[in-house]
Curated annotation (Swiss-Prot):
Domain of life, per lineage: Bacteria
Keyword match Methyltransferase: yes
Name of this chain's protein: Ribosomal RNA small subunit methyltransferase A
E.C. number: 2.1.1.182
Signal peptide: none
Family annotation (InterPro entries): KsgA/Erm, rRNA_Ade_diMease-like_C, rRNA_Ade_Mease_Trfase_CS, rRNA_Ade_methylase_Trfase_N, rRNA_adenine_dimethylase, SAM-dependent_MTases_sf
Subcellular location: Cytoplasm
Reaction catalysis annotation: adenosine(1518)/adenosine(1519) in 16S rRNA + 4 S-adenosyl-L-methionine = N(6)-dimethyladenosine(1518)/N(6)-dimethyladenosine(1519) in 16S rRNA + 4 S-adenosyl-L-homocysteine + 4 H(+)
């Protein structure tokens, strides 16, 4: 039997499907998620229910969002899960997560995300950060390193800045390829993202912050002076107290927010 087949389902490359099969890793992830009925529990991409079953066992209801129509149909007739699941068959990238919020109950979101859409999907979820208590995601290890990076390191980039603007980022555990069917070609890791109730560095306009990050990191080896020339001059850097001779990876999240706010005030 092909190593792409698990529980009678063939993994689909176009959906980026790799099914988690290691029981010890599954238990550790469920422990980190800490399912409860005080929050609306939401799983993105339940697949063949490796996380769905143990999470649903201890709670009254679990909402799942599954793009693959065949897998959504399997869940609808699952002998132990069908009465516990609220199933949305569709694209999580287009899903309005605010519709799931209930009075006094924020969302806890988790999933083994398809690696080919993990970054844009996280950016989509950041738009609903005020409604989310925390998120636990299986991602490429490289992406988790970028999310949790510190200034001055090679992994630090625009994804780091935007993620850490919205959330506390905590790596949870590493997961080798052999824990999946089929095994991915890269190492994986689980990360916890906890949206700030009050952002430590409030930004006037998140789109401006995104623009500053995109422009600054466009050419990593060049200085801020070169990369941000369309937006900021030396006199502006002097006002901000930022050394224009530094490279983009040397600048903190707070400093990126300060640049974005300064540009908003200059408009």
């Amino acid at each position: 039997m092909s190593n792409k087949v698990h529980l009678g389902h063939t993994a689909r490359k176009r959906f980026g499907q790799n099914f988690l099969t290691d029981g010890n890793i599954i238990n550790r992830i469920v422990g980190a998620i800490s399912p409860d009925d005080d929050h609306v529990m939401v799983e993105i991409g339940p697949g063949l229910a490796a996380l769905t079953e143990p999470v649903a066992m201890g709670i009254k209801n679990l909402t799942v969002i599954e793009l693959d129509r065949d897998l959504a149909e399997r869940l609808k007739v699952h002998p132990t899960l069908k009465d516990k699941l609220t199933i949305h068959q569709g694209d999580a990238m287009k899903f309005d997560f605010s519709q799931l919020v209930e009075p006094e109950r924020k969302l806890k979101v988790f999933g083994n995300l398809p690696y080919n859409i993990s970054t844009p999907l996280m950016f989509h979820l950041f738009e609903f950060a005020e409604h989310i208590e925390n998120m636990h995601f299986m991602l490429q290890k490289e992406v988790v390193l970028r999310l949790s990076a510190s200034p001055g390191t090679k992994a630090y980039g625009k994804l780091t800045v935007m993620a850490q603007y919205y959330c506390q980022v905590v790596p949870v555990l590493e997961v080798p390829p052999g824990c999946f069917t089929p095994p991915p070609k890269v190492d994986s890791a689980v990360v916890r993202l906890v949206p700030y109730a009050e952002k430590p560095w409030p930004c006037h306009d998140v789109e401006m912050l995104r623009k500053v990050c995109n422009t600054a990191f466009n050419m990593r080896r060049k200085t801020l002076r070169n990369n941000l020339k369309p937006l900021l001059q030396d006199a502006d850097f002097d006002v901000l107290g930022i050394d224009a001779g530094l490279r983009p990876e040397d600048i903190s999240v707070a400093q990126y927010v300060a640049m974005a706010n300064y540009l908003c005030e200059k408009r």
